[in-house]
């Protein structure tokens, strides 16, 4: 029996061929199911990538693993993208092409797929089988839409709100801190003198000078506060006339920047925030907490001192003989006038030694510094949230601008359908 237990508990006793046969008969695991038609797997290294050699590389790779990487499998293209929308736009523009450009491809070459179509909108609709596209969601309020045109119209609300909030703030107030702790006069002067930038000018002129990280050496956080959102009444601009790859790089830049800014936000909620059940968690006050703990240990009560012999027999326990205290006449007690000239010795004074004064000053300085740092952290968090909202609006706006033409062609109805739809009536006509 012990020999059987030894065989069951040891891995070396099971031959490798048996392990391989069990692995072949086992059903598909959840990790294998993650390999979809887009050709990617979570936590799988990209072919040709190198292992990190420093702690900074390890943290960067860990952050990148949080977001899935998409590989283009059209004729072994191998291009890598961070968003399904970017991969879908790459397929429609670079591989499917257009008839006007004489590079229209109506047959699917994704992996082993051999689907054939007769129109461009048919092949673009078929590509959604291979690309894990999701409904277009607003990064600010998480509302979802079927088409980028609908999301683009919805973004007008957030653009107007952001412009109103910026107009209420005083000019130059974003570069000034509320507390005495600041970043330096040179950085504040630079923040005040930075010119306002439009989205088109930032993408065409300034974007190549920055890395998509919030706290970089180029002070991208100060430049973001001076970007002017496009007017809600005229969504479009000069980016529509730029090459598709140009806008695609801008979408990838703001997507990576939004992910980096979201990671920098504090993930811990305040102490008095509602818990998962929706109840308010209140911490006890210090005086209430320490009031429950007795200051001195409990002592048994002593019997009262009495002088009458009748009361003594009832109050005092048996077997104990206590003698009453002798009475002292009042004439023998000293008068209080003798201590009148020494009254100043018993009055509390606010006089401290040099060491006590130094320790008090250090405690006051530490408290003021802690309060200033807390206010500075709150100001930085508020500024980060406001700038993250601006970055998300720009990201969604550029994504809608990128895929607007593709979805317009896919959702267009034939002329015969539109003509027949115009003749339909809401209620049937009744003939008498």
UniProtKB/Swiss-Prot annotation:
The gene is RIM101. Keywords: Activator, Cytoplasm, DNA-binding, Metal-binding, Nucleus, Repeat, Repressor, Transcription, Transcription regulation, Zinc, Zinc-finger. This is pH-response transcription factor pacC/RIM101. Gene3D superfamilies: Classic Zinc Finger. Residues 46-61 have a biased composition (Polar residues). The keyword DNA-binding applies. GO terms for biological process: positive regulation of transcription by RNA polymerase II. The keyword Oxidoreductase does not apply. GO terms for cellular component: cytoplasm; nucleus. Binds to DNA. Interacts with RIM20, which binds to the two YPX[LI] motifs and is required for proteolytic processing. A motif (YPX[LI] motif 2) lies at residues 427-430. It is found in: Cytoplasm; Nucleus. One of its GO terms (molecular function) is DNA binding. A motif (YPX[LI] motif 1) lies at residues 296-299. A zinc finger (C2H2-type) spans 70-95, 106-130, 136-158. Belongs to the pacC/RIM101 family. Its main location: cytoplasm.
